[in-house]
A protein has these predicted regions:
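GHKL-type ATPase core
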Residues: 2-22, 38-169
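Active-site-adjacent bridging/hinge elements
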Residues: 5, 29-40, 108, 191-203, ...
Length: 313
């Protein structure tokens, strides 16, 4: 919005409009306005979701001067609207009205960040660009297999309907930039292109969360790629290359689902769950390795070794 208010909406099923049996608080208020009320604490229950501690939107409200939630529970025929003010110091009583059970469900949340407290004048172009990038992330990792999900930003649909189209946004179309793609099952998919400037680059997701710094999931896939490529090159070229010589040529795109993932911080930039606890396995195929080699990785790695040997000679 022009005044810096941020709005998010989802036209899936609404939130149950009922009081929580244990806390005697309306469930939407509990979800959005009370800290540490997540249902994802129980580590004995295997989940492949991103949220865990129940902070999320509550932190947004704490750093906002105003917030509002709306949801339609079409099963109960109810609409719920509630406002929050003063950095979550004030939680207004909800307004609950009856609606026809034929009403389309939805959930909408909005908040106006406390720009003064954050030392900002408002949203700048870089922040808006980051929001748009995150919306593209959501479109890329959303399951479109059952029903095509439309994802939009500022009233414009995002032209991303799967992970491969997301890769296109980084490296261009397949005609512009060669890349190799593979998926083993619904929990693992990945693509490799040549890294710009021969510097390893990764774009990865765990349970829909963008892990900017990578993590054990990236190490898991890259470990297989570098090890298998080293063996492949040694067999065909009789040259030993280092895993580093392979890695620095690769740009990896990875999307995976991991059971009860853990991260090094609340920002969830780095996933540190060991591979033994992923809840699934992924084996990079020999065909995928051969295609990466032919992408140019093998020739460059061999050239680097030969250049080093000539320099030493």
């Amino acid at each position: 919005e022009a005044d810096g208010t941020i709005i998010l909406s989802n036209d899936g099923n609404g939130i149950d409009i009922a009081k929580h049996p244990e806390y005697d608080v309306w469930i939407p208020e509990l979800i959005f306005g009370h800290l540490r009320t997540s249902t994802n604490y129980d580590k004995s229950e295997k989940r492949i979701v991103g949220g865990k501690n129940g902070f999320g939107f509550k932190l947004a409200l704490i750093w906002s001067t105003y917030g509002r939630i709306e949801t339609v529970d079409h099963r109960r025929g109810l609409k719920y609207v509630q406002e929050f003010r003063g950095n979550l110091d004030v939680i207004e009583e909800p307004v609950i009205t009856k609606v026809p059970k034929s009403s389309k469900p939805y959930t909408k949340v909005l908040f106006k960040p406390d720009y003064a407290r954050l030392g900002l004048q408002g949203l700048d172009a870089n922040m808006v660009a980051l929001f748009k990038k995150r919306v593209c992330d959501i479109a890329a990792v959303t399951d479109h297999s059952i029903k095509s999900v439309k994802v939009g930003f500022n009233d414009e649909l995002v032209p991303v309907k799967n992970f491969q189209q997301y890769v296109d946004r980084y490296v261009g179309s397949k005609g512009e930039t060669k890349r190799i793609y593979e998926t083993t099952d619904e929990r693992w998919e990945y693509a490799v292109a040549l890294a710009p400037n021969q510097e390893f680059t990764q774009v990865s997701f765990v349970n829909g969360i963008c892990t900017f710094k990578g993590g054990k999931h990236v190490d898991y896939i890259m470990g297989q790629i570098t090890r298998k490529l080293c063996d492949y090159i040694e067999k065909r070229k009789k040259i030993k290359v280092s895993p580093t010589a392979i890695k620095e040529q690769i740009m990896l795109f990875l999307r995976c689902d991991v059971v009860n993932p853990s991260f090094d911080s609340q920002t969830k930039d780095y996933m540190n769950t060991p591979s033994a606890k992923f809840g699934s396995t992924c084996q990079v195929s020999d065909t995928f390795i051969e295609k990466i080699a032919k992408l140019g990785v093998m020739d460059v790695a061999c050239s680097l070794i030969e250049a080093k040997d000539n320099k030493l000679a």
